[in-house]
C-alpha cells in the first residue's frame, strides 16, 4: 500500500553515567580515584534510500530508539558508546515536529543523510575531579539524558510537471501513453489514490518527470476527501498541466473545473498559482466538427488571454499529445530549475533544551543546593570551567538565567555548597 505520511516517536540514546571508584591494589594504599567515563548515547539519523518510494513501513512500527551509552567502570574504563539508529526514508520526505508542524529537515536533492537527534553526552568519572584540596572525590557526572521527539513524515513527490484535474478526466490514461508508468485505470472517483510518476522521453528535446496528482474534488484545500494528501505533492513541481474533459462527458463545465481547481490550489498555498500552467483539453475524440471547435474556443477565450496555452488532445488516440509535450519541454527551460527544498524551521537540539526549565532546590539531608535542567547540563557539557575564560562564562550564564537570584531567594549564604550534575562549588559573592 502506498503511504505518503506517518507519525512516529524517536529517541536518541542516553549518555552513560560516570563511575565512582578508587584504585585498590596491593602496595598502593592510596591509589586515588579511577572511575571511568560513561559512553555517548547513539544518534538518530535519517537517510535517503533510493529503493524506497513509500512510507508504508512506518505504519507497522511507530517507536524508534537509538542505543544508550554504557556506564563507566573502575580502572578508568570508559563505557561503550550507544549504537546510532539509522532510519531510511524515500527521497522527498519532509520531517516535521508534530505539535507545531514546523519543518525539521527536507530529505531531498543534496540532503541524503542528517542527524536529527544527538545522543546524550557520557558523564565524567570521578578520576576527573581530584584536586589538591579534594583528593577523594566521591561523585561523578551523570550521563546526559536522551532527547525525545514526536515527528511527522510527509512524502512529497519530486517531479518537473504536475498533472491535475478532477476524477475521470483521463490523467492515468495520458500518463500511461506518454511514459512507461503503469497506473491503474478505471472510471471511478478516487481510483488513483497515490501519485504516479513517469519519465517523458522526447526526440530532439529535453525530457521531464511528470506526476499524476490523484483526482481532486471541491474542498480539497480544507482536507475534504484526501485533499491535503494530494495537494502537497504539487508543491515541488515546476509546471502544472490542467487536464479537463472538453467533451463534458460527465456533465461538468471544463472552464469551471479549471477555476475550481485553481481555487483549491490557491487556498492550500497561494504560491502554487505562480507556477506556469498549461491546459490539456482532453476527450476531443468524442467531439465532431463545430461541436469540437466550439468547446475548445470556449476554453481558449477563458484562459489564453491570461497567458495559459490550451491544447486540444485525446489521451486515448494520442491526437495533439506530442505538441503538448514539446511545448511543456520548452516551457520548463524558462522556469527556475533550482530544486524546491523546504527550509528548516525547527531545531530539535535547541528547541528541546530551551523549552525545558531548570530547577533550583535545597536538599536538607545533604545540606546542599541542587541546580538541574537540560540547559544547565548542556552548558556544562561544552564549557571547560577549569579555565579562566570558561569559569567567567559559567558565572555569566548563572547570572543571566536568574539562577543566582533563585539561590539567594532560597537563602544561600557565603560558603554554602551548590551541586550541578556531579560538580560541587562553594558559593561566594
UniProtKB/Swiss-Prot annotation:
The keyword GTP-binding is assigned to this record: yes
One GO BP annotation of this record: ribosome biogenesis
UniProt EC number: 3.6.5.-
Record InterPro entries: G_OBG, GTP-bd, GTP-bd_Obg/CgtA, GTP-bd_prot_GTP1/OBG_C_sf, GTP1-OBG_CS, GTP1_OBG_dom, GTP1_OBG_dom_sf, OBG_GTPase
Binding residue positions for Mg(2+): 172, 192
Major place of residence: cytoplasm
Annotated function: An essential GTPase which binds GTP, GDP and possibly (p)ppGpp with moderate affinity, with high nucleotide exchange rates and a fairly low GTP hydrolysis rate. Plays a role in control of the cell cycle, stress response, ribosome biogenesis and in those bacteria that undergo differentiation, in morphogenesis control.
Full protein name: GTPase Obg
Organism from which the protein derives: Lachnoclostridium phytofermentans (strain ATCC 700394 / DSM 18823 / ISDg) (Clostridium phytofermentans)
Lineage: Bacteria, Bacillati, Bacillota, Clostridia, Lachnospirales
Gene name of the record: obg
Amino acid at each position: 500500500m502506498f503511504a505518503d505520511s506517518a507519525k512516529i516517536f524517536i529517541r536518541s540514546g542516553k549518555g552513560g553515567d560516570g563511575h565512582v571508584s578508587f584504585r585498590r591494589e596491593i602496595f598502593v594504599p592510596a591509589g586515588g580515584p579511577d572511575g571511568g567515563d560513561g559512553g555517548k548515547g547513539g544518534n538518530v539519523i535519517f537517510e535517503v534510500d533510493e529503493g524506497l518510494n513509500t512510507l508504508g513501513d512506518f505504519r507497522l512500527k511507530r517507536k524508534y530508539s537509538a542505543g544508550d551509552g554504557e556506564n563507566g567502570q573502575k580502572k578508568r574504563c570508559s563505557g561503550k558508546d550507544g549504537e546510532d539508529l539509522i532510519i531510511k526514508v524515500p527521497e522527498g520526505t519532509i520531517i516535521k515536529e508534530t505539535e507545531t508542524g514546523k519543518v525539521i529537515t527536507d530529505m531531498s536533492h543534496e540532503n541524503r543523510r542528517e542527524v536529527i537527534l544527538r545522543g546524550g553526552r557520557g558523564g565524567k568519572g570521578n578520576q576527573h575531579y581530584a584536586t589538591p584540596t579534594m583528593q577523594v572525590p566521591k561523585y561523578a557526572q551523570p550521563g546526559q539524558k536522551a532527547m525525545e521527539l514526536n515527528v511527522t513524515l510527509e512524502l512529497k513527490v519530486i517531479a518537473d510537471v504536475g498533472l491535475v484535474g478532477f476524477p475521470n478526466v483521463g490523467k492515468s490514461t495520458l500518463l500511461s501513453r506518454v511514459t512507461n508508468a503503469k497506473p491503474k485505470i478505471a472510471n471511478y472517483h478516487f481510483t488513483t489514490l497515490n501519485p504516479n510518476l513517469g519519465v517523458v522521453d522526447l526526440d530532439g528535446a529535453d525530457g521531464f518527470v511528470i506526476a499524476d496528482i490523484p483526482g481532486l474534488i471541491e474542498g480539497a484545500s480544507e482536507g475534504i476527501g484526501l485533499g491535503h494528501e494530494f495537494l502537497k505533492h504539487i508543491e515541488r513541481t515546476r509546471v502544472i498541466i490542467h487536464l479537463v474533459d472538453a467533451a463534458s462527458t460527465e456533465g461538468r463545465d471544463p472552464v469551471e473545473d479549471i477555476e475550481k481547481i485553481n481555487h483549491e490550489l490557491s487556498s492550500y498555498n497561494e504560491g502554487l498559482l505562480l507556477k506556469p500552467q498549461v491546459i490539456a483539453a482532453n476527450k476531443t475524440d468524442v467531439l465532431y466538427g463545430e461541436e469540437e471547435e466550439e468547446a475548445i474556443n470556449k476554453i481558449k477565450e477563458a484562459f489564453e488571454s491570461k497567458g495559459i496555452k490550451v491544447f486540444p488532445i485525446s489521451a486515448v488516440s494520442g491526437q495533439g499529445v506530442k505538441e503538448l509535450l514539446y511545448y511543456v519541454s520548452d516551457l520548463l527551460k524558462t522556469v527556475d530549475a533550482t530544486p524546491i527544498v523546504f527550509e528548516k524551521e525547527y531545531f530539535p537540539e535547541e528547541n528541546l533544551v530551551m523549552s525545558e526549565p531548570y530547577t533550583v532546590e535545597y536538599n536538607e539531608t545533604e545540606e546542599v543546593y541542587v541546580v538541574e535542567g537540560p540547559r544547565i547540563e548542556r552548558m556544562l557539557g561544552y564549557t571547560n570551567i577549569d579555565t579562566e575564560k570558561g569559569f567567567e562564562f559559567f558565572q555569566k550564564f548563572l547570572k543571566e538565567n536568574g539562577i543566582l537570584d533563585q539561590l539567594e531567594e532560597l537563602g544561600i549564604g557565603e560558603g554554602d555548597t551548590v551541586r550541578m550534575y556531579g560538580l560541587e562549588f562553594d558559593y561566594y559573592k
